[in-house]
Amino acid sequence: SLSGGSLAVNPENSSILNREFNCFVCGSKQKVKAFQLKPHTQEANRNIFGITSYLASMEGHDYIDFNKIRIITCPTCLFSSINKDLFRKTEREKTPDILTNQKFRTAWIKDVKNRHASLAGKMKELDSLNPSGEAVIKSYELAIQSASMLGVANNDESQKWQAVTLLMTLAEIQMNNGDVEVAESYLEKARERADNLFKNAGHAIVSFKAARLPLFIGL
């Protein structure tokens, strides 16, 4: 059994480390399972949007498309993120400021039942190294919703930008699957959000990234 965010090699894939956390948002005792990619195990490439795609494994390592399994999801309240620092590693760990926002916590917990219903029994797949395409989309939708709500409640532009990058990663996954039309629809959603962020951003770096994105999408 893993504790305190400690690492263990996944028995199915030597390139993946298993971790367990707890959820800051709902405080459930239920373990939050997460996968971590071992460094230098995959040949990776960044596209023009800065999104990493995993092309092949390095010699002597198992292949994994880490984008498909990188979202960490609490099985109780379904709070989801790619950021492991938003999950509790030890009992004594202080809750990150962004997660102490009562407005966010209340809104998130209030809608848990609907969120579970929309997941439609896919939770088990989120713990798998081979989730279905539908389960991958659901996990990203949960992470996008989490980042968007955190961004609005805390007026945090970096969280709002994370929702944009998650949409672009989802587009990359769909492109690799050959679903060009679906990929383009995610890119369009990312462009709309980036446009909106650029108009309202006070954060210089976020504003710069948001301004560049529509240019890249137009290439």
Q: Model regions: which residues?
A:
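N-terminal cysteine/histidine-rich coordination modules
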Residues: 1-100
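Long C-terminal interaction/binding lobes of large macromolecular proteins
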Residues: 186-189, 196, 200-219
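Generic detection of long, well-ordered alpha-helical segments
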Residues: 12-16, 133, 183-184
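Amphipathic alpha-helical repeat scaffolds of TPR domains
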Residues: 100-149, 154-179, 208-219
